[in-house]
Each structure stands twice: as structure tokens, then as C-alpha cells.
Amino acid sequence: MATPTQSPTNVPEETDPFFYDYATVQTVGMTLATIMFVLGIIIILSKKVKCRKADSRSESPTCKSCKSELPSSAPGGGGV
């Protein structure tokens, strides 16, 4: 049986900078995941994502992006 050559010294333990309260991390993570999931479902099911007034001449920011995707709604009615 081997004996230690030095006696153990009492070194004050420093606080670990990577110590996490895993219960809190898990709770916050699940809460954020739930919120993002519900917001994603709301965005998918929302009618506001689609451009309902693509035929009108209003220049709302939503319809501006829709008009760039639809070649038939371009001025002059020409295709790309």
C-alpha cells in the first residue's frame, strides 16, 4: 500500500464559472420552445401571411413582397 509523500493542503475552492442550475435551464428552455412552437403554428395558420389584396393597387409592404413573387401581377402583365 502506498502512502502519500505530501500531506493534503487546504486550498480554498474557487467557484466553478460553469456551474448551472439545470432545473432552471430546463424550465427556461422548455418555456421558450413552447412559445416558439405556438408562434410558428400561429404564423402558419394565419391568413395575414398570404397577400389577400394582390389584385388591388395598394402598396402595402406585405403585398409588395407578394407582387415580386407573382409574375402575372407585375406592371404590364408580362411574365418573367
Swiss-Prot record:
Lipid bilayer topology: Single-pass type I membrane protein
Family to which this protein belongs: Belongs to the FXYD family.
Result when mutating residue 3 to A: Does not affect interaction with NKA
The protein's name: FXYD domain-containing ion transport regulator 7
Lineage: Eukaryota, Metazoa, Chordata, Craniata, Vertebrata
Pfam families tied to this protein: ATP1G1_PLM_MAT8
Stretches assigned to the Cytoplasmic side: 46-80
Subcellular location: Cell membrane
Annotated organism of origin: Mus musculus (Mouse)
Binding partners and assembly: Regulatory subunit of the sodium/potassium-transporting ATPase which is composed of a catalytic alpha subunit, a non-catalytic beta subunit and an additional regulatory subunit. The regulatory subunit, a member of the FXYD protein family, modulates the enzymatic activity in a tissue- and isoform-specific way by changing affinities of the Na+/K+-ATPase toward Na(+), K(+) or ATP.
Extracellular face of the membrane: 1-22
Cellular component terms per the entry's GO annotation: plasma membrane
Effect of residue 80 to A: Reduces the rate and degree of FXYD7 O-glycosylation. Decreases expression at the plasma membrane
Superkingdom field: Eukaryota
Keyword line: Cell membrane, Glycoprotein, Ion transport, Membrane, Phosphoprotein, Potassium, Potassium transport, Sodium, Sodium transport, Sodium/potassium transport, Transmembrane, Transmembrane helix, Transport
Region: Disordered, residue numbers: 55-80
UniProt main location, coarse: membrane
Mutation effect (residue 5 to A): Does not affect interaction with NKA
Transmembrane helix is among the record's keywords: yes
